[in-house]
Regions:
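A short core secondary-structure module
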Residues: 125-126, 130-176
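A structural signal for short hydrophobic beta-strand segments in well-ordered beta-sheet cores
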Residues: 118-121
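Short beta-strand-initiation
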Residues: 113-116, 144, 161-163, 189-191
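Amphipathic, small/basic residue-rich leader segments at the start of a protein or domain
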Residues: 1-67, 74, 78, 83-94, ...
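Short beta-alpha junctions and helix-cap segments that line functional grooves
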Residues: 88, 134, 178-182
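FAD-binding core of FAD-dependent oxidoreductases
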Residues: 60-73, 93-105, 132-147
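Short Gly/Pro-enriched turn/cap motifs at secondary-structure boundaries
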Residues: 107-111, 137-142, 155-157, 183-190
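Flexible, small-/acidic-enriched active-site or ligand-binding loops
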Residues: 115, 173-192
Length: 192
């Protein structure tokens, strides 16, 4: 077990070996109901497998079924264009990279997205994002390469139609991790 700041640059070495075994046994990407990308299981069928995976802290990652990657892959599979799927979904589906999801903000009850303050404004063919997030699931993992950032893009719309999820590489200029948060004394390294 690594200690101190080194905990953020390390993940269990056995994971890669277990991933290869899971792929060989057909125990890979079980969460995606779309058979083109996943195993084609219903949520009910997957629930039984998720319950079993929950008995080990590394099983879901070893089978490429851990959050926030699962939700992020579902979003990109369902709403991403061909370029998004080629650049981000395929490496996620292969288990080559990890992802992060950024919604929670300081000073707001971020489980209610209508409170969100972060914004994204279209500038030409790119979005300029402004805002601070308080907790970004997965951002601490050294393999994290893509971020889904939830923000307000249509401030004049009704409160439940104001938001978008923006894909951004973690290495984008301006993306900065200031500190890893502790919740009930835990920081969930290296995942965060």
């Amino acid at each position: 077990i690594k200690v101190g700041s080194e905990r953020w640059n390390h993940y269990p070495e056995i994971i890669d070996e277990l991933k290869n075994k899971a792929k060989a046994e057909g125990l890979w990407n079980l969460f995606l109901p779309e058979s083109e990308f996943g195993a084609g299981l219903s949520n009910y069928e997957y629930a039984h497998l998720a319950e079993e995976m929950g008995k080990s802290h590394i099983a879901s990652e070893a089978m490429n079924c851990s959050a926030p990657d699962t939700g992020n892959m579902e979003v990109i599979a369902r709403y991403g264009n061909d370029s998004h799927q080629e650049e981000w979904l395929k490496p996620l589906l292969n288990g080559d990279i990890r992802s992060a999801f950024s919604m929670t903000e300081p000073g707001t009850a971020s489980s209610d997205a209508t409170n969100m303050q972060a914004t994204a404004v279209l500038d030409g063919d790119e979005y300029v994002i402004n805002g601070e997030k308080w907790w970004t699931s997965g951002a601490g993992d050294p393999r994290c390469k893509i971020l889904i950032f939830m923000c307000v893009t249509n401030p004049d719309n009704p409160k439940h139609q104001r938001h978008s999820m923006i894909l951004g590489p973690m290495e984008t200029e301006g993306v900065e991790i200031k500190q890893m948060m502790h919740v009930f004394g835990y920081d969930d390294a290296p995942h965060g």
